[in-house]
Amino acid sequence: AELIGIGIGSTGPLDINKGIILECNNLPTLHNYPLHKKIESTFGLPVKLDNDANAMMLGEALWGAGRNLNSILGITLGTGLGAAIVVNRKIIRGATGCAGEIWLSPYKEGMIEDYVSGTGISNLYQRITKRKISGEEISKLAREGDINALKAWKEFTQALAYALSWTVNIVDPEVVIIGGSVMHSSDIFWDSMVSLFKKYICPQTAASIQLKPAGLKDNAGFMGAAALMFVE
């Protein structure tokens, strides 16, 4: 098949018109990086750039857990925290392109991303134990009943429920789709998170809203990025 272009789902926030990564909390060397220009000049093909959460949820809207639904809030739980709003299979970017950038919202002593992300769960465990280990190791310990790992996941769960409730009370979507690498540990936090989340939102919303894991799993971002070439 002929290659017609390259779609990219990048960490953000971005200036999509200029093709620049504006800021990156977890990868500071990418601040103001001209990604669009670099890729286009390297490959000589048209490039469409969007943030990774938007790309992932566009994929889910077209082929995954949001298929046949009209209003979607997507959350990505990876190294950082991302969110996306897709309505009628179109990404809602807002006036400046920053719609869904909930990661820097204030929470306790820092930002919500400091608590709700792969980095966040490691930070929470380190605060309790003074030991720095990976999220995968913390999940393993939690499944074995380790009290400190379970405490860290409990705080993560509370923070995630808060973050979802803030956003859902504003956007009122049909479905919340959650994806990203942290979802490999969803058996630890999912049921508790859903229960807490529904306490913090409007009763009418709680009665009808769906919460789903990403249906395309790790393929959602790739598929959504490719779709940018012909949907957007």
Region spans (language model):
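ATP-binding/phosphotransfer module of carbohydrate and carboxylate kinases, centering on a glycine-rich
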Residues: 1-5, 14-20, 37-45, 62-69, ...
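Short glycine-aspartate micro-motif
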Residues: 3-7, 48, 72-76, 82-84
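A charged helix-plus-loop insertion that forms the helical arch/lid used to bind
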Residues: 19-31
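Generic enzyme active-site microenvironment
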Residues: 50, 58
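Gly/Thr-rich phosphate-binding beta-strand-loop-beta motif of the actin/hexokinase/Hsp70
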Residues: 74-91, 118-121
